[in-house]
From Swiss-Prot:
Protein name: Urocanate hydratase
Active site positions: 411
Molecular function via GO: urocanate hydratase activity
Chain sites annotated for binding NAD(+): 53-54, 131, 177-179, 197-202, 243-244, 264-268, 274-275, 323-324, 455-456, 493
Lineage: Bacteria, Pseudomonadati, Pseudomonadota, Gammaproteobacteria, Pseudomonadales
NCBIfam families: hutU, PRK05414.1
PANTHER family associated with the record: UROCANATE HYDRATASE (PTHR12216:SF4)
Length: 557
């Protein structure tokens, strides 16, 4: 970026311990999590405020970041800070059970909800792309998507390979903040993986954090390693420096047959996130400033080639699926008429979980102490004693996942269990078992908090894929319930014009008041997911609503 206000050569690290720098834990928590989003161990490009996902930023510019920090340190417990696309625009009197921060990022009136108009606004300093958890201050590094990716690979193994992916291998691309979870998720599921990435710096980061095991010198070397490890039944992840739009067609040409194919490049943002075939990264970034339309066209043409290769694999009978980056849409716009012949991962593998309100529940230890996370891991096992799959996940996470920034954990649980765990964590803070408060949040990719016809709400039973009332209702309900901060975003995951979604974070500070808020929010939030899927006619969701006592007037009334 050429705007000096969007670049600062500084390293940010959230405070640790139990000493406040703000007036209460309800304002200290968003302050620390904002700073944690920009920790160099966490963010992809923190000096430009970019957390992950192409240009997903934590604040609009450095002046806005400074003012957010300053405002949070003085904010009272009966005040609410309003943040508009990464800019702090107002502080208003509310009450002690209201959110301390309300955030709206990247939202545009539908007719203007496209990258061209957004980029004009961004260039003028009038907007910011918040992705999902970048601008809502609850990104925890690649761990945040590891379990969801793991669950996807495990379910694919159940559906296609008799219950296991051992001795199988996954072909994919993208090792950014989200895609970087793929190699570790495949390894944890028991599969090998070949992970193509066009930036060596991202490969180095994933090697350093142990998300990927090793790097091949070239494609031939990668294929030799894959053949060896699958023959030995070993689950080892391999990174390959290169361009997916060049390598996938070459694999098709050679007759190489993976066992599973997906992709998690930043295809949602052709101007900033997808390197055209034959280009260097330096060419791409330079021309994005001077010839944006040509860059977008070249990137989308390469995506069309990439998707055609994925379709070729699918024709061979290889399980092939989109992992939520909107690459099928981009390819379709470039003339690949049947780009949507392979499904998205949600309708293919994840929707039954969403029907029960199960999704990416996460928490972070504001103390900075890893031991606080290990104690909460043990509490989860204690309170959910009979879920062997969940216990195995927690054991693998402790063994294999390196914390990035403040220690955190991701754990997919649903309606009923989220509130149970939240109340237990709050009690652990009250008793002193945890050395400081924890925050509980989630990805916007959850059962009731997103409308995204090419991802989370693809192929809904009743055809309501594009109805975006649901994330709005989710945000309103979480605000009414007393979440500590609530966010409403547009364009996350799949890009401008293709999604609306909401997020929430709540603080466990050990008080009675926190317990009341936790009980409300962590019941209502997944409850909206069950409601949304029950309304669409899913029997699993209807049964869950009845079992959990949800009051759905048109269904349970």
């Amino acid at each position: 970026m050429t705007d000096n206000n969007k670049y600062r050569d500084v390293e940010i690290r959230a405070p640790r311990g139990n000493k406040l720098t703000a007036k209460s834990w309800l304002t200290e928590a968003p302050l620390r999590m904002l700073m944690n989003n920009l920790d160099p161990q966490v963010a992809e490009n923190p000096k430009e405020l970019v957390v992950y996902g192409g240009i997903g930023r934590a604040a609009r510019n450095w002046e806005c970041y400074d003012k957010i920090v300053e405002t949070l340190t003085r904010l009272e417990d009966d005040e609410t800070l309003l943040v508009q696309s990464g800019k702090p625009v107002g502080v208003f009197k509310t009450h002690s059970n209201a959110p301390r921060v309300l955030i709206a990022n990247s939202n545009l009136v539908p007719h203007w909800a496209n990258w061209e108009h957004f980029n004009e606004l961004d260039a003028k300093g009038l907007a910011m792309y918040g992705q999902m958890t970048a601008g809502s201050w609850i990104y925890i590094g690649s761990q945040g998507i590891v379990q969801g990716t793991y669950e996807t690979f495990v379910e694919a193994g159940r559906q296609h390979y008799g219950g296991t992916v051992k001795a199988k291998w996954v072909l994919t691309a993208g090792l950014g903040g989200m895609g970087g979870a793929q190699p570790l998720a495949a390894t944890l599921a028991g599969a090998c993986s070949l992970n193509i990435e066009c930036q060596q710096s991202r490969i180095d980061f994933r090697l350093e954090t142990r998300y990927v095991d090793e790097q091949a010198t070239d494609l031939d070397d990668a294929l030799v390693r894959i053949a060896k490890y699958t023959a030995e039944g070993k689950a080892i992840s391999i990174a390959l420096h290169g361009n997916a739009a060049e390598i996938l067609p070459e694999l098709v040409k050679r007759g190489v047959r993976p066992d599973m194919v997906t992709d998690q490049t930043s295809a949602h943002d052709p101007l900033n996130g997808y390197l055209p075939a034959g280009w260097t990264w330096e060419q791409y970034r330079d021309r994005a400033q001077t010839e944006p339309a040509a860059v977008v066209k070249a990137a989308k043409q390469s995506m069309a080639v990439h998707v055609q290769a994925m379709l070729d694999f699918q024709k061979q009978g290889v399980p092939t699926f989109d992992y939520g980056n909107n690459i099928r849409q981009m390819a379709k716009e470039e003339g690949v008429a049947n780009a949507f012949d392979f499904p998205g991962f949600v309708p293919a593998y994840i929707r039954p979980l969403f029907c029960r309100g199960v999704g990416p529940f996460r928490w972070a230890a504001l103390s900075g102490e890893a031991e606080d996370i290990y104690k909460t891991d043990a509490k989860v096992k204690e309170l959910i004693p009979d879920d062997a799959h969940l216990h195995r996940w927690l054991d693998m996470a402790r063994e294999r996942i390196s914390f990035q920034g403040l220690p955190a954990r991701i754990c997919w649980v649903g309606l009923g269990l989220r509130a149970k765990l939240g109340l237990a964590f709050n009690e652990m803070v009250r008793s002193g078992e945890l050395s400081a408060p924890v925050v509980i949040g989630r990805d916007h990719l959850d059962s009731g908090s997103v409308s995204s016809p090419n991802r989370e709400t693809e192929a809904m039973r009743d055809g309501s894929d594009a109805v975006s009332d649901w994330p709005l209702l989710n945000a309103l309900l979480n605000t009414a319930g007393g979440a500590t901060w609530v966010s409403l975003h547009h364009g996350g995951g799949v890009g401008m014009g293709f999604s609306q979604h909401s997020g929430m974070v709540i603080v466990c500070d050990g008080t009675d008041e926190a317990a009341e808020r936790i009980a409300r929010v962590l019941t209502n939030d997944p409850g909206t997911g069950v409601m949304r899927h029950a309304d669409a006619g899913y029997d699993i969701a209807i049964d869950c609503a009845k079992e959990q006592g949800l009051d759905l007037p048109m269904i349970t009334g």
